[in-house]
């Protein structure tokens, strides 16, 4: 606060909020600017939540319903609703009306969405914070519907896609903890099903749940729940790693850990979640957006089976864009794992080469290359190079059969508990396609800035972008021809490791602010059109116990036992 500037008196912001809400027409951005992350006053919570859920002024969806409570599972619905009423401090004369409201909301939702009710869905716990707002039945339904639609992910059940995604996020930030849970066969759905399905209301007290929802609904980001869940795990890490209990007991301890949250913990919970969020690639959201929202939008899910993904995948467009931005944010150190002849024919100009074939063919040279890689990463960050980044992103060819060795290298780094490890989605083929797509006027508009060649064939590579294919027929952007030229076997022997590191640092030391080229996010449909669904991330190499955690790059052990 500037010198001489007086702090607003206590309750001043609450008065401003009340006035803004009273005037009407208040949007979420206005509300957020007034609240600034503080806990909402009880008497204003209902209005703010309705704004955050975008249900202000919505009609009564139940108006045309006949009110018949006649589903086959109606007795189960009634029983669960009655148990909720019994747990709440509700005046006796209001219980019957409230019971009918809750049962009507669930019944109508099941009928209108053609969903079969089951107690394990956790809807009762999701309704509890809303019931405490004492909303009219129409608002209660609209709020419940909005939460289900916007904030509860599709397939939120055992072995569902949301939990495979959470495991990848955990592995990205806390590989040691993830590996430990993997070895115990404690999958995220075994302990976090009710965290995600009830937005923490299953285990947290009413006050704590309200405080969490106050912040979460204002975020207007459904993926933020993943980072709140991550912080719960990170907070319990030491306890988890020290546990010697059996699997079932450990799951119980972990599952109930949100119950330990208190009101004064919520501010730190959100601050830490924001930090981890800022250290996560944007592709985490962009590539999984179909998890949330209308079922019609999610019918065509990503081809990648997240249960088989070795690690988080990052789009090539994000890789190019991320290393141009200044200040804080995710920046990638790209590791090209293709054979030397493919790398020399053409590669991302900022990429470091680590020939994955060496892992089996020459382990000692591979070990030296890994040490050089980590040293190059460290120096590129310190020098302000555009190639510098904390986040390691491995790039293969994009062909599953060719990337098997790269997957082994990836598994090697993950086994060593290296954080911030990802894979370039679609590999070098996807990079070629993206650069061809955004440079519609040919290589002179910027293609050469990103593709480098150490074989003297840059001109032939560039000319193939908008030239004819080898068989004489043009494919528009010459991508097929480009792929052929880039992957031709030159049988060039790999350069000396030391010289490679020096050359890499010298050639990529341009400060970030000297690169004005702005890469746009590609149209999602465009990528899906050109990158085949067979270009998978690759088969996983999991189930390997962690050897040790990296504390110092100089001590990185790369000997393959």
Describe the role of every protein-language-model region.
Residues 159-163, 167-276, 402-417:
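Alpha-helical bundle/repeat cores within regulatory domains of eukaryotic proteins
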Residues 8, 22, 39, 187, ...:
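Beta-strand elements of modular eukaryotic interaction domains
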Residues 20, 34, 51, 84, ...:
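Alpha-helical recognition domains of nuclear gene-regulatory proteins
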Residues 2-4, 50, 227-333, 339-341:
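C-terminal regulatory/linker segments that are acidic, Ser/Thr- and Pro-rich
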Residues 8, 12, 16, 26, ...:
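Acidic, Ser/Thr-rich intrinsically disordered and amphipathic helical segments
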Residues 68-98, 137-193:
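Alpha-helical cores of eukaryotic small-GTPase signaling modules
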Residues 1-114, 127, 131-134, 324:
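N-terminal transition regions in large eukaryotic proteins
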Residues 284, 288-317, 332-333, 337-561:
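Rhodanese-like catalytic fold shared by cysteine-dependent sulfurtransferases
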